[in-house]
Amino acid sequence: MDWFHCNQCFRKDGAHFFVTSCGHIFCKKCVTLEKCAVCGTACKHLALSDNLKPQEKMFFKSPVETALQYFSHISQVWSFQKKQTDLLIAFYKHRITKLETAMQEAQQALVSQDKELSVLRKENGELKKFLAILKESPSRYQGSRSITPRPVGITSPSQSVTPRPSFQHSSQVVSRSSSAESIPYREAGFGSLGQGGRGLQGRRTPRDSYNETPSPASTHSLSYRTSSASSGQGIFSFRPSPNGHSGHTRVLTPNNFAQRESTTTLESLPSFQLPVLQTLYQQRRHMGLPSGREAWTTSR
């Protein structure tokens, strides 16, 4: 040790040296027992030998050796602590990855819930407006529900329909006298009843022809056939009764494709039939066509 010497006489050689509690070194000749010769303070003395304690020997060792020894210990301590730190960092990294995934899922759910919330708010606003309108005018919507169209029953063409009496022209009675000779006639220029009615309106109206007095020849057999697809009434035959009374006629109507015969009065027939028949008869009469047994038929 190059630095070791007596602090009083500065000797380096010698066998016996002492160290005081105040940190001074003295040789055997310079040492004093009461107080330190350098600083003058009361102190204790310790003789230097190989039997010193480790905590006392460390002051006389090389600093490099002490540093290396401590550095080795420090390195072991640092390596142990670094391993623990690495494990903790790996745990936190794994946890951060999980939290980031959960955060992304939560953000996506939040966006979808925001969209759904906006849609629900819009729908709620519309329903509130509609409810306010209903509270202001409830009778308006009840009236609209009451005028809802309902299904209408349609009579099957196979069923027989009895003509209703015409109260409009029931007071007017057309008298027809019996005749020995039947004057049937057939419409020549009209294909159907609807077309014949339109063709006759150009010459005379049904009201004018209805007001005319029929001739005695009108009591003979008149046959009126309607289209089964349009009216479903079948065949109406106007025939004089055997006893000469022209107030009744025999009407043939089909019922389930089987004809049945019923008796009704001329006044009970629909009011639109007599003017048309009279008009056609008057035209036939003015045209001067010969009479025969052919039945006049027309289809609606």
UniProtKB/Swiss-Prot annotation:
Autoubiquitinated. Keywords: Chromosome, Coiled coil, Meiosis, Metal-binding, Transferase, Ubl conjugation, Zinc, Zinc-finger. It is found in: Chromosome. GO terms for biological process: chiasma assembly; homologous chromosome pairing at meiosis; protein ubiquitination. One of its GO terms (molecular function) is ubiquitin protein ligase activity. It catalyses: S-ubiquitinyl-[E2 ubiquitin-conjugating enzyme]-L-cysteine + [acceptor protein]-L-lysine = [E2 ubiquitin-conjugating enzyme]-L-cysteine + N(6)-ubiquitinyl-[acceptor protein]-L-lysine. Residues 191-200 have a biased composition (Gly residues). Its EC number is 2.3.2.27. The keyword Disulfide bond does not apply. A zinc finger (RING-type) spans 6-40. Residues 141-232 are annotated as: Disordered. Signal peptide: none annotated. CDD domains: RING-HC_RNF212B (cd16747). Residues 166-182 have a biased composition (Low complexity). Its main location: nucleus. The keyword Phosphoprotein does not apply. Ubiquitin E3 ligase that acts as a crucial factor for crossing-over (CO) formation during meiosis. Essential for normal prophase I progression and for ensuring appropriate CO designation in meiosis. Recruits key components of the cross-over machinery either directly ou indirectly, leading to the activation of the MutL-gamma complex. The function of RNF212B in CO designation is dependent on its catalytic activity. Homodimer. This is E3 ubiquitin-protein ligase RNF212B.
